[in-house]
């Protein structure tokens, strides 16, 4: 079998949610956008619901369909993108709650789905989504008359606890919402870890659930094992892969494994170098990562196993991300469709 195995530990996912929830004195929701950060939103959502999550967030209305089918009619599912043109039927049929981002969305929602639950997203300084303070003040009374279920905003720099932007956005959010008897939410994973001043009524962790930074105590949720297709011997001076970027300095043994950038194993991982693991033994990935293949120096192994591990407790999502000068979010959500996904609980 030449398919790589992506092992997803749903117990670790649930423990991460419970441990984050224990840091708050408010409700803890769960963000399962981008198909559950690449791990399949239905499976992830069910595990988180069993752990205790009662509210979930997705990016766009279409993502809510599979999640609602998996969760059934009870839990809340909110949509960050709000109420886009053509969304009314999806929002109604799948009981999705849009986080309205603008006056246009507000008018669209009130006209097409009167009485349907909604929240409002406010821009506290990130300048990405949400109503700015002046726009909010102009329509606030209209919105409040329709009974929003949540007022929310999003932090730009919460992964940097000492960044002044955090306090600035907190101040702005308080000024925009103070005195209103509506549940509020500001914190994702990073904001939750900043402390209870940022928690309000609901926290909505995402990446921390899946084992990623900035939640340093997160349990790893994913393991990736890639099958060995072929092993060959090289003499000193022979090269490996495109561009001859790696040249053997000694008698070497090279394993070619069945994964590549088409599977989300980016060429950029080679900027700082990554390892493939045979049990606990690291073996350097050498040469360029190509679309479907990766080459590994297994010279020092007594025996080459049928699979080598690229993601595990040692080489985590964030270790891979750092090697490519990116973030764990990008690594997780890039994991391709060719993997055989298995789930343990």
UniProtKB/Swiss-Prot annotation:
EC number of the protein: 5.1.1.1
Active site annotation, chain numbering: 33 (proton acceptor), 242 (proton acceptor)
Top EC group: isomerase
GO biological process, one term: D-alanine biosynthetic process
Keyword annotations: Isomerase, Pyridoxal phosphate
Gene Ontology CC annotation, any one: cytosol
PANTHER family, per the entry: ALANINE RACEMASE, ALANINE RACEMASE, CATABOLIC-RELATED
Name the UniProt record assigns to this protein: Alanine racemase
